[in-house]
């Protein structure tokens, strides 16, 4: 399988630097101007990319505005961290194509991916595979994703 531009960039940075930092911007409680400031400061501090997403719904227009604002101030990749099919913006460079591996709901294992794939292809967004496992309390992502979280203190 041929790697996309963003995935190749991330892997090359990891190989060269041994580890990288990726900043997560949750568009739910932030304005596009605030998001662009976070992205600019993060890039200046050495972050390799900006992830955009969260556990709850944000309007498509707001998500698009946040992605565009971030892209206007940084030249590092933007990677969507989608909460659902509604978390796809045509303005992003890439998207984590996630499967919530400890969900009891098939929708979060493969259903959302099936629904989102045509949009990702249409928008020409680079998909990057990710197996996602919720640990600890699980928080909002665990509740929405119907996950059985892996406890931090699970005995061997």
Across the structure, where does each feature detected by a protein language model lie?
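Active-site beta-loop-alpha junctions enriched in small/polar residues
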Residues: 25-30, 55, 83-85, 100, ...
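Short, acidic/polar
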Residues: 29-42, 83, 154-156
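Acidic (Asp/Glu)-rich catalytic clusters
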Residues: 13-15, 39-44, 73
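N-terminal amphipathic alpha-helix/helix-capping segment at the start of soluble metabolic enzymes
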Residues: 1-25, 36, 116-129
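Hydrophobic faces of well-ordered beta-strands that scaffold small-molecule active sites
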Residues: 20-25, 50-52, 78-80, 95-97, ...
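Glycine-rich, proline-tolerant flexible connector loops at the mouths of alpha/beta enzymes
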Residues: 51-65
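Conserved anion-binding
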Residues: 87-156
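Alpha-helix-loop-beta-strand connector modules within alpha/beta enzyme cores
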Residues: 61-86, 115-128
